[in-house]
């Protein structure tokens, strides 16, 4: 994947599609996933985004569970994570439990998201 590739993990179809389009408009490559399990499957199949943008509240494998699974896998643990959440309490719990690289509260301005993603879009070293 390109060094500006984002794995967008969001269960809300409209938000996932609008985020994906906004990121593409800003020069990012995008791989969408509807939940944590789909994201994990993509990663286990070899997807290597430079950053993961994920919601916490999703059906099935949620954002917390995905983050824990990523942490347990040495090959995936180093991929930066930007958490998005509609609930600040939820986001604060995530930060305290397992600090992400960035955390944004929904709704957010797209420029703030782009800035956060660009901070973390460095190519990962090859293993």
Model-derived features with residue positions:
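Conserved acidic carboxylate
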Residues: 10
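Charged docking surfaces used in two-component/phosphorelay signaling
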Residues: 17-25
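Acidic, metal-coordinating helix/loop segments flanking the phosphotransfer/catalytic sites
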Residues: 32-51
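Acidic catalytic/metal-coordinating carboxylates
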Residues: 35-38, 61-68
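Active-site residues of response regulator receiver
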Residues: 55
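Receiver (REC) domain active-site loop signature in two-component systems and cognate sites
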Residues: 58
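C-terminal output helix
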Residues: 108-121
């Amino acid at each position: 994947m390109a060094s500006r590739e984002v794995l967008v993990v969001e269960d809300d179809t409209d938000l996932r599609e609008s985020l994906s389009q906004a990121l593409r408009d800003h020069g990012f490559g995008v791989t969408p996933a509807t939940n944590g399990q789909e994201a994990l499957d993509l990663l286990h199949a070899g997807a290597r985004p430079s950053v993961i943008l994920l919601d916490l509240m999703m059906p099935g494998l949620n954002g917390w569970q995905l983050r824990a699974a990523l942490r347990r896998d040495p090959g995936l643990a180093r991929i930066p994570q930007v958490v998005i959440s509609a609930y600040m309490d939820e986001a604060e719990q995530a930060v305290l439990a397992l600090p992400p690289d960035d955390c944004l509260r929904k709704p957010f301005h797209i420029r703030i998201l782009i800035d956060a993603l660009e901070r973390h879009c460095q190519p990962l070293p090859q293993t």
